[in-house]
Design a protein with these regions (language model features):
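Short hinge/gating elements
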Residues: 3-7
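Absolute protein N-terminus
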Residues: 1-2, 71
């Protein structure tokens, strides 16, 4: 199975928090910082976990008011 790749523009201060939280969902996704200077992250998502990761990203935006934009 191939990973689903999604890229996001986030706030730099949130990168570590996002990585820690997303990767705590064992096997759901791996977070890579593509460009720390402009805070671009790449998620490599397990196809079976895409809905979980999408819901998690939505929760970050709605419940925690994080600025996350898919690019």
């Amino acid at each position: 199975m191939n990973s689903i790749i999604k890229r996001y523009k986030v706030e730099r201060k949130d990168i570590a928090y996002l990585r820690y939280t997303i990767e705590s969902y064992d096997g759901a996704a791996v977070v890579v910082t593509e460009d720390p200077a402009i805070a671009i992250i790449r998620l490599m998502i397990s196809p079976l976990c895409e809905n979980i990761v999408d819901e998690l990203i939505s929760s970050f935006v709605q419940d925690e008011s994080l600025n996350i934009q898919e690019i």
